[in-house]
Amino acid sequence: MFKKGLLALALVFSLPVFAAEHWIDVRVPEQYQQEHVQGAINIPLKEVKERIATAVPDKNDTVKVYCNAGRQSGQAKEILSEMGYTHVENAGGLKDIAMPKVKG
């Protein structure tokens, strides 16, 4: 019985801990309202530095940024990396993302 308990405890602590995943739409609010990835938060590129800590307080969480074509999301990725976010992905343009979308 004791060995089974130790084995179960060892398994729990050996499982990887996954950080949360956040989708950030860096387009202007009007574009976000027309269509966006389901669950995404709208933080326009020019506001990323000021607002990201509220939306994503843990810098080890996965942050996926997107825009219309990938240029602004590339800039956002650079900004977030410079701010210490460790898992930032440029997801490119909205049309290229294979995730459920919400249309306004």
Swiss-Prot record:
One Gene Ontology term of the molecular function aspect: thiosulfate-cyanide sulfurtransferase activity
Recorded catalytic activity of this chain's protein: thiosulfate + hydrogen cyanide = thiocyanate + sulfite + 2 H(+)
Span of the signal peptide: 1-19
Pfam families associated with the record: Rhodanese
Induction (UniProt): By heat, ethanol, osmotic shock and infection by filamentous bacteriophages. Expression is positively regulated by cyclic AMP-cAMP receptor protein (cAMP-CRP). Expressed at higher levels during growth on glycerol, acetate or proline as carbon source relative to expression during growth on glucose.
SMART domains documented for this protein: RHOD (SM00450)
SUPFAM superfamilies the record matches: Rhodanese/Cell cycle control phosphatase (SSF52821)
Site residues, May be important for providing the necessary conformational flexibility for enzymatic catalysis: 93
Annotated function: The phage shock protein (psp) operon (pspABCDE) may play a significant role in the competition for survival under nutrient- or energy-limited conditions. PspE catalyzes the sulfur-transfer reaction from thiosulfate to cyanide, to form sulfite and thiocyanate. Also able to use dithiol (dithiothreitol) as an alternate sulfur acceptor. Also possesses a very low mercaptopyruvate sulfurtransferase activity.
Assembly mode: Monomer.
This protein's name: Thiosulfate sulfurtransferase PspE
Gene name of this polypeptide: pspE
